[in-house]
Amino acid sequence: MASFQLPDPAGRAGGACTSALLNALYAEKNAPSKDLTWVETLEGMRKMLRAKGYEQIPQLTSSRMVDVNQNFYIAPPNCTGTRRAVLIGINYVGQQGQLSGCHNDVNNIKEYIMDVHGFEEKNITVLMDDGKHTSPTRQNILHAYETLVKNMKRGDASFCHYSGHGGKLSDTSGDEEDGFDETLVPLDYVQAGQIKDDDIYNCLVTKVPEGATLTCLMDCCHSGTVLDLPFKFVADGQSSEMQFDEAFDIAHLINLAGLAQAIFKGDKAAAIDIVKDAAKDAVTGWLKKKFK
């Protein structure tokens, strides 16, 4: 743990994606006749990032196949329940690798979701290392995620935003093809450790109830697979639809199948309907890797 160092902010990673996304979305808001699709939104982000000298390629991952040629949303149009959000911005004030734009990211994204998507301040939890909000420690971040999904019900839409450093740690569970877990780096990472993708998956992703929607924006290094989801769209200018991620761990899919069955209270047919397409692709890809 002590050997991990925050990356040099000159690496031009912190906050770039949030800014690019908001630029694209506010441009669309100012031209209401032009509804952006997921593809247009992510490719618009990529163009803005490249124009500013950034190398990131925006990605969308999902627990199910999403038609990326449909309109982009943070809260789905059919949302009938409560809209909640957890927004985290860490500048690592006073530490090596200090960032400067993550607090602004949170303030800007908060204004956007309230102004455009109808989120109410009372349902927005903010964690920032500014001395005014709840400190973004490891414990506080995980608690915020756990509280968010604990309160979610059918018809609700929740949004999580993280702007800060991301990292990698050696995988100890054997579920990562590249041998590394992607991580979020909390303020107290030296004392408490980083937050692994497995932690996020277990406390956040698997706890979302049936009929509710969770959308996350992770603006940090190594964030492409930090939620450990099976479907992926990469805005590289060549893809036009979401694909099954062949690096996805088959065990996670089995867990999702079990979760679906639990949600439907033993209704195996309903559970199978949720995961059958994913299972078919996952098993095929997994067998190809195992027996090639």
Kindly label every feature range from the protein language model.
Residues M1-K292:
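Cysteine endopeptidase catalytic domains of the caspase/legumain-like
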